Amino acid sequence: MQCLLELLRGQGGDRAIEDAEWETVLALAQAEHVLPWVVARARSQQVPLSPAIASRLNEIEREAAITAFYWSAELQGVLRAFERAGLKAVPLKGPLLAERLYGATALRVSYDLDLLVAKADMARAGDALKAIGFTSGVPDDYHCQWYRKGTTVELHHDVENPLAFNFRVEGALRRALSADFQGQPCRQLAADDELLYLCLHAVRHRFERLSLIVDLQLAFQKLTGGEDGFQLRPEVAGLASLLTLGLAMARRLQPDLALTLQPPAAPARTRHLEGLADRLWNRLLTEPGQPPDWRALHAFYLELELPGWPRLGPRLRHLRILLGRVIEPDYAFAAKLGFYRTWQVRMLRPLRLLSRVPRR
């Protein structure tokens, strides 16, 4: 892992890397979803390469270019369908983010497409996806997955349940800027909203992979204007802990990252989040990444708060989420009983949850 971190930090040219170590580094980079970026960093540092490793890096670059072409074409097609429907969506992450932060679509790994539309436009957006061959999955409390062969589109009307983290998505959509992706019109989040979203996205995945932290490192460098103080829009000031933790994690990767958050967090909260960042970073370096389930994720959300009374409000909100959301197992449970309507599924959810309680 140390050699991989050195390459990501721009320190890889300081020593020779044996072929066996290269293979370990490349396997780790693939597992951490940063393989094309590591190759690009090695190229920029002019790291000496044996013929075998040089050939391997060429192969990685070819595969990344082919994959990026596929996802770029898929994103263009979806945006084109939305344009025909009179919709302009905000691509979240994916090829558009790769262009903006990494400099090329082939340098950031994509496995699906995420697009954000207003909640009132979800039905029209779904119809537009159906028209180009997508089929719908089961919606949850803030998005719905759509499928077509090897492509998954996650269609969002929010970026998380507002009871967990209220992104105030309506304000973010109003502030979104006109943009285009390879000639196809779309929208993009304002820089401060995009940075907050990327911090929230990393928290939602519990910083399980280096790719999440590389996104944040580049975002803090390129979306904040450098060392000047960075401030959230007032309506999401309550999410400042996400930025504080995101910056702390980005600095674990790039310690010289210079940025001031305004207003600065209280000293006790800063110490708490720095300690949390230490634990997350140590786990990332020593344990294989595992996507957290819903309960583990919401337990992690509580860790962002100081221990004691500050966690009471989030606990109550998470209980409301647990009681009010419906997910795929709820639909499957209701279907076994012959019920299919969403309101019926919602009514039966408490029964499903109770059926999972172990009997003594």
Outline where the language-model segments fall.
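Conserved NTP-donor binding/palm subdomain of two-metal-ion nucleotidyltransferases/polymerases, i.e.
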Residues: 1-111, 117-360
